[in-house]
Amino acid sequence: MKKWLMVQGTTSDAGKSVLVAGLCRVLARRGIQVCPFKPQNMALNSAVTPDGGEIGRAQAVQAQACGIAPSVHMNPVLLKPNSDTGAQVILQGRALSNMEANAYHDYKKVAMDTVMDSFQRLQQEYEAIMIEGAGSPAEINLRENDIANMGFAEKADVPVIIVADIDRGGVFAHLYGTLALLSESEQARVKGFVINRFRGDIGLLQSGLDWLEQKTGKPVIGVLPYLHGFDLEAEDAIAAQQNLSADRQLRVAVPVFTRISNHTDFDPLRLNPNIDFRYVGQGESLSGADLIILPGSKSTRADLAYLRSQGWDKEILRHLRLGGKVMGICGGFQMLGEWVHDPLGIEGEAGSSEGLGLFAMQTELTAEKRLTNVKGHLTLDGQTVAAQGYEIHAGHSSWAADQKSPIILSDGSLDGLVSDCNQGFGTYLHGIFDRPETALRICQWAGAKEIEAYDHRAAQERAIDRIADAIEQHLDLTLLWPDL
């Protein structure tokens, strides 16, 4: 029997992504061929598929939970915001164009055809598809032409469960109100509710569960407990959990840009118990770090201006004068050069922005985006380790032949730079910290001589298994699939 199920939420960050990942692992454990699917994702955290397409990182993690490679059809529409009112539209892994919100609202009727094409392809290949909604299905202003929630569920004729985060408070109002704002046909599609992140005695919640079931006629499929210390890649929001301690081997600071992209790059550092890691927000100081890392950006020139508005440029230069280390990834790497040129207005108004000048490097943004998974070797301080990652960038950086590139890729090409003073290191590779030995080598270069390696992939697997175990224990899955 085919198993299609869509997980929608009462709010953003209700637990949809994690619940889908857990359900994928539960079904995969039973030998069921399962895959994830999200019709439309709005996120600056993206992944590269084996065939060179771009999808949301959440779907890549969910594919990992299934034990399969990610595909562009698992997230056929990806929106990458590049301003408060606009985004780059990516269809089936390929960039289409930049659109303002009003233009995209009209375009969604066309995008639905792409969504259905991808979904139907997956239906032919898999026994089960776990589908993730976006935000809330009860956003009245977004109901017209909806492709992310009930608009898709109705078109594809799939059942829905609604999840809410009780840790935020107001869970019964969220669930009851969300259901009430749906049409009759949409309400009929809802098979039940899941309450997420509950702390305390479940007996004290029972009267509320009984009331909800009586008022709505829908079952509460289960109540998932609050999993202390649980951490699985955030879909887009910066993770609140940070590693702050005075006795760590290395202190790392990452400034949060207005259009920061792929901040999941830093999860292997943020979760490493040997590292004091902090994100630095608006009005905060970078001081006190051993290593400052400039992250990726969807709008490099705009975020370079933002960096200067925060006074971080002066702090970075002072940090270098005092012997500290600075690293840049993708857009952050571009910022460390001399100039970033955007003659075509790829990221906004055409023009050029002066970089921080750590590298004698010029970057020109171009319409063509490079999307690829790569492997190679990284050499820092004369020691070489295996390295891998993925590139997602528009533009090309050039530098003099006598400058040192620390990364040699498997095709013989070079990536990144190390400054003459050995205090700066830049690379285009997202995910460079995912391999334990690579992260260890970079941390040692930054001054942490006795730091221990941290296996982020193994930690991800433990987190996926943990949520799957909680689902097995606390959800009545026979309410969804009697034959399971």
UniProtKB/Swiss-Prot annotation:
- Presence of the UniProt keyword Metal-binding in the record: no
Mind listing the GO molecular function terms for this protein? ABC-type vitamin B12 transporter activity; catalytic activity
Keyword list (alphabetical) reads: Cobalamin biosynthesis, Glutamine amidotransferase
Matching entries from Pfam families are given as:
CbiA (PF01656), GATase_3 (PF07685)
Q: Which InterPro entries match?
A: Class_I_gatase-like, CobQ/CobB/MinD/ParA_Nub-bd_dom, CobQ_GATase1, CobQ_N, CobQ_synth, GATase_3, P-loop_NTPase
Q: Which SUPFAM superfamilies match?
A: Class I glutamine amidotransferase-like, P-loop containing nucleoside triphosphate hydrolases
Q: What does this protein do?
A: Catalyzes amidations at positions B, D, E, and G on adenosylcobyrinic A,C-diamide. NH(2) groups are provided by glutamine, and one molecule of ATP is hydrogenolyzed for each amidation.
Question: Know the name of this protein?
Answer: Cobyric acid synthase
Organism, by scientific name, is: Vibrio cholerae serotype O1 (strain ATCC 39315 / El Tor Inaba N16961)
What is the taxonomic lineage of the source species?
A: Bacteria, Pseudomonadati, Pseudomonadota, Gammaproteobacteria, Vibrionales
